[in-house]
From Swiss-Prot:
Annotated source species: Mus musculus (Mouse)
Region entry Disordered, spans: 1-48, 97-134, 278-306, 340-417, 511-543
PANTHER family membership: ENDORIBONUCLEASE ZC3H12A, N4BP1-RELATED
CDD domains referenced in this protein's UniProt entry, alphabetically: PIN_Zc3h12-like
Binding site for Mg(2+): D226
Cofactor list: Mg(2+)
Protein name: Endoribonuclease ZC3H12A
Length: 596
């Protein structure tokens, strides 16, 4: 059938393209007549068939497609038809679900894999199946369980039902019970049986299996049911539920012996309650949940709570768990000190730190080469300022050896003096701190030995310049500070302590560690008498007492803490002498460095 334009209809090999071309053609030709039947009169048969074929490829039935097309018309948009088909399909599915409501689950279900599952199951059963697949198959020794429940006198079939229901409640689906077939016979007074109908019910559910037996010449021939039990459990990698140890079967095969030792689940009956142990393989074995699973769950390694609770007197040696105690390493102080000593990095020697600074010998040689003829003799000045040959190379030397005063044209300027003072004192204090507490006292004695050795010699008096006159009593007379004192001749050389405090016109220091700027010096012909360095009232006496006290505190703390921790904390807090406060700081310092 041809269209109004005289062209042939679109090939049916591509229904999607034909559907869209038909829609475009109908939209371009004009509006449809509302008084005509959209299916019978307007749309050709081939067009209707193409649409039906198209939607059938999407999975819808012909009846559904025809009903929707009769409702919407052939000219309806594809998305509209699809939306109506989806609604129609969902309504049909709801009607089918309402008609096929799931029946209540019976108390006893067949073993997994023996019979096909019915199609009308609850939605939660797939999760139960997945849960049951993680559980081991269970093989129950029916004779042993029934006789145990009957107190070794009666074959109580109710005991078998209690055991089966216990495993069903835990999610097991693969359960097998073995019972000799002669137990189906009528009970006799010498062989009492109770609730014999339970055996037939369990057999109908494909849970109970009768082992074969027969009569030969009026005598019963019974097959060994224990071999059925062990063999099935071994082949299915399951669990045997019995209080029998199967000693005769353990001797038959070595793999059976090991299997029975590892997979035998014993039990007890408390009236009508089936109770297997929570630790089937002993206190140190797996739990009952892991014992019945193919892949055991990850266990929480947590200690058993201490039975004494807060009244426990074992302290950190208690092997039980104490929830009231904070989570800290349960080790003694000695063990912690040993562990910290092994973990702490080795300390670098002091000579490595001193090697980073320029050598004093190179400084003295460079100064002496720059000296002019009219200035001080460089060699003589270096010899006077050096502490002596016995101190060279010593690791505890605090004062720089071989250091000489800067010489420039026979006089000192403020720039040269500032550079010299900044290069001398900070090295002394820093290296003494690095060498430990015990070296502070030796540092003081060595410094006083350099200065002249006599108790009556001059000492420091002014605070800002107290550490700047290590050359005061040793430097000979020479022309000094010619830019500031042109009228002064070769007089007595004075050290920075002889100068007046800096006037307010000098700029303030940018950093607190910088020395004060020096003003023009005043002529000093003779140094005044100052108190001896050993006097208790002077600052040097106070420093000596402080060093002795710090040495005592250091010795006490080293008896408790590692020496490197004590040194590190005492370097942080040089003015702190309270042992308790220092101990607290050491503990906090140790915890910070251990966490790093």
């Amino acid at each position: 059938m041809s269209d109004p334009c005289g062209t042939k209809p679109v090939q049916e090999s591509n229904p999607t393209m034909s559907l869209w071309s038909l829609e475009d053609r109908h939209s371009s030709q004009g509006r449809p007549q509302p008084d005509q039947d959209p299916v019978a009169k307007e749309a050709p048969t081939s067009e209707l068939q193409m649409k039906v074929d198209f939607f059938r490829k999407l999975g819808y039935s012909s009846s559904e497609i025809h009903s929707v097309l009769q409702k919407l018309g052939v000219q309806a948009d594809t998305n509209t038809v699809l939306g109506e088909l989806v609604k129609h399909g969902s309504a049909t599915e709801r009607e089918c679900q309402a008609l096929t409501a799931p029946s209540p689950q019976p108390p006893l279900v067949p073993r997994g894999g023996s019979t096909p599952k019915p199609s009308t199951l609850e939605p939660s059963l797939p999760e139960e199946d997945r849960e049951g697949s993680d559980l081991r198959p269970v093989v129950i020794d029916g004779s042993n369980v029934a006789m145990s429940h009957g107190n070794k006198e009666v074959f109580s079939c109710r005991g078998i039902l209690l055991a089966v229901n216990w495993f069903l409640e835990r999610g097991h689906t693969d359960i097998t019970v073995f019972v000799p077939s002669w137990r189906k016979e009528q009970p006799r007074p010498d062989v009492p049986i109770t609730d014999q109908h339970i055996l037939r019910e369990l057999e109908k559910k494909k849970i109970l299996v009768f082992t074969p037996s027969r009569r030969v010449g009026g005598k019963r021939v019974v097959c060994y049911d224990d071999r059925f039990i062990v063999k099935l459990a071994f082949e299915s990698d399951g669990v045997v539920v019995s209080n029998d140890t199967y000693r005769d079967l353990q001797g038959e095969r070595q793999e059976w012996k090991r299997f029975i030792e590892e997979r035998l689940l014993m039990y007890s009956f408390v009236n009508d309650k089936f109770m297997p142990p929570d630790d089937p393989l002993g206190r140190h074995g797996p739990s009952l949940d892991n014992f019945l699973r193919k892949k055991p769950l990850p266990s929480e390694h947590r200690k058993q709570p201490c039975p004494y609770g807060k009244k426990c007197t074992y302290g950190i040696k208690c092997r039980f768990f104490h929830p009231e105690r904070p989570s800290r390493p349960q080790r003694s102080v000695a063990d912690e000190l040993r562990a910290n000593a092994l973990l702490s990095p080795p300390r670098t020697p002091v000579k490595d730190k001193s090697s980073q600074r320029p050598s004093p010998a190179s400084q003295s040689s460079s100064v002496s080469l720059e000296a002019e003829p009219g200035s001080l003799d460089g060699k003589k000045l270096g010899a006077r300022s050096s502490p002596g040959p016995h101190r060279e190379g010593s690791p505890q030397t605090c004062a720089p050896a071989g250091r000489s005063l800067p010489v420039s044209g026979g006089s000192f300027g403020p720039t040269e003096w500032l550079a010299h003072t900044q290069d001398s004192l900070p090295y002394t204090s820093q290296e003494c701190l690095d060498s430990g507490i015990g070296s502070l006292e030796s540092q003081m004695s060595e410094l006083w030995g350099v200065r002249g050795g006599s108790p009556g010699e001059s000492g420091p008096t002014r605070g800002p310049y107290a550490g700047y006159h290590s050359y005061g009593s040793k430097v000979p007379a020479a022309p000094s500070f010619s830019p500031f004192r042109p009228a002064m001749g070769a007089g007595h050389f004075s050290v920075p302590t002889d100068y007046v405090p800096p006037p307010p016109t000098y700029p303030s220091r940018e950093y607190w560690s910088e020395p004060y700027p020096l003003p023009p010096p005043t002529p000093v012909l003779q140094e005044p008498q100052r108190p001896s360095p050993g006097a208790g009232g002077g600052p040097w006496g106070r420093v000596g007492d402080l060093a002795k006290e710090r040495a005592g505190v250091y010795t006490k703390l080293c008896g408790v803490f590692p020496p490197h921790l004590v040194e590190a904390v005492m370097r942080r807090f040089p003015q702190l002498l309270d042992p308790q406060q220092l101990a607290a700081e050491i503990l906090s310092y140790k915890s910070q460095h251990l966490s790093e």
